[in-house]
């Protein structure tokens, strides 16, 4: 019981968040709702080829766009819209902000 009383003030004074904003953004970017943003937009948001496929005699590519230059408001609006390929995630504005900040922080690292 004495040990609990000694530890309790430390627990109460510690940061109330389980993870930092940056960690939250990274977690969401790499696994928001089962399908990672990075699978189509790349580890840094740089965009990437998702798949190459044949249509008749032509080889076409389905490409996830570079999202590093998107503004926060553009990202919020884009995530509200229907996209033919991209799943809907129904992210909150706080979640989109965490993802946006995660991408912004990594811009110079490629």
Regions found by a protein language model. Give the residues of each.
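Glycine-centered loop/turn positions within well-structured domains
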Residues: 35, 73, 84
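C-terminal capping alpha-helices of c-type cytochrome domains
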Residues: 76, 88-110
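Gly/Gly-Pro-rich "capping" loops immediately C-terminal to redox-active cysteine motifs
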Residues: 38, 42-78
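Surface-exposed patches in mature extracellular/periplasmic domains of secreted proteins
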Residues: 36-39, 88-89
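Soluble non-cytosolic domains of exported or imported proteins
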Residues: 19, 31, 69, 89-94
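Electrostatic cytochrome c docking/interface patches
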Residues: 12-33, 110
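Sec-dependent N-terminal signal peptides
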Residues: 3-13
């Amino acid at each position: 019981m004495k040990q609990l009383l000694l530890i309790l003030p430390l627990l109460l004074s510690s940061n109330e968040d389980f993870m930092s904003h940056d960690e939250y953004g990274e977690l969401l970017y790499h696994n928001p709702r089962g399908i990672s943003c990075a699978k189509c937009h790349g580890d840094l948001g740089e965009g990437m080829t998702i798949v190459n496929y044949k249509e008749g005699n032509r080889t076409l590519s389905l490409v996830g766009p570079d999202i590093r230059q998107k503004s926060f408001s553009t990202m919020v609006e884009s995530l509200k819209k229907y996209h033919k390929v991209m799943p809907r995630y129904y992210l909150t504005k706080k979640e989109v902000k965490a993802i946006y900040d995660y991408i912004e922080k990594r811009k110079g690292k490629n």
